[in-house]
């Protein structure tokens, strides 16, 4: 049986990376929410 999680750095960065987050309004909201909460890591 194939496992469901097959990690790929490029895919991860394109979907969850900082620049991907900053590209959309909701993504920026996510970053701001994590900043307000005081997260050490804002994105992957």
Swiss-Prot record:
Pfam families: Ribosomal_L34. The keyword Ribosomal protein applies. One of its GO terms (biological process) is translation. Keywords: Ribonucleoprotein, Ribosomal protein. One of its GO terms (cellular component) is ribonucleoprotein complex. The keyword Lipid metabolism does not apply. One of its GO terms (molecular function) is structural constituent of ribosome. InterPro entries: Ribosomal_bL34, Ribosomal_bL34_CS. Gene3D superfamilies: 1.10.287.3980. It comes from the Bacteria. Belongs to the bacterial ribosomal protein bL34 family. This is Large ribosomal subunit protein bL34. It comes from Vibrio atlanticus (strain LGP32) (Vibrio splendidus (strain Mel32)).
